[in-house]
Amino acid sequence: MSATVTFSVDTAQGPRDVSVVHRRAGSGDPVLLLHGIGHHHQAWDPVFSILAAERDVIAVDLPGFGASPALPDGFAYDLAGFVPVLGALCAALDIERPHVVGNSLGGLLALEMGREKLVRTVTALSPAGFWTQAERRYAFGTLLAMHRGASLLPRPAIERMSRSAAGRTALTSTIYARPWRRSPEAVVAETLALRESTGFHETLAAGRTVQLRDAFAMDTDAVPVTVAWGTRDRLLLRRQGVRAKHTLPGARLVRLPGCGHVPMNDDPALVARVILDATA
């Protein structure tokens, strides 16, 4: 069951209320799960129960995505806007320095939370930001095409396509290496989440200036970092994982054989094991 938490975040214009939808289960060390751009917390469903058997797991809809409302006026959809909100969210949920796991945009946010020492460990699955400008333009163009396609398709067409493996492949093969494994209901829900995400365009625009290279200094002794990359990632190409390792030499780099950009669907057991090992 999902729940909504509302909390206050300080801004230059005074405190503002932010609401975040999340799913929480399990017990033990807290693990915060952050999805990618245009997705929702259900991206973590394939691994959620496995993780919740050993951890206190909180999967969130980032503001402006999934069922969470947009950020209030005056907030930017960039690192400087998102990270204080996530810090305030942790305080509202009474979790102090959780382990954080993020995919794509969520991985970028997780790394920034780690850089600011807001978390115990960081596990970043195909994190955004380790691209060249050409790779970024390719990824953003692909994301815009996905968003446009989801916006143009009537809901009955999405539901009809999702009933077949071929249709699910057409809708989601950019992010999944094994799109047929995703249930029809999940594909419908995430396609609708993509087109209805109020923060999509502002987040994408903010990402144009992000490039995590030598200037991204992070103490990986104080906050251990694991970076994992699918060998069949078609959105953020796997060579970006090698670049991440060069940028963060203290990080652990893990290959996810046969996995795409959102690896939780492609190999839930492997991804869960990587997360549990990283948060032990």
Please place each PLM-identified region on the residue numbering:
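Flexible "cap/lid" loop of the alpha/beta hydrolase fold
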Residues: V119-R155
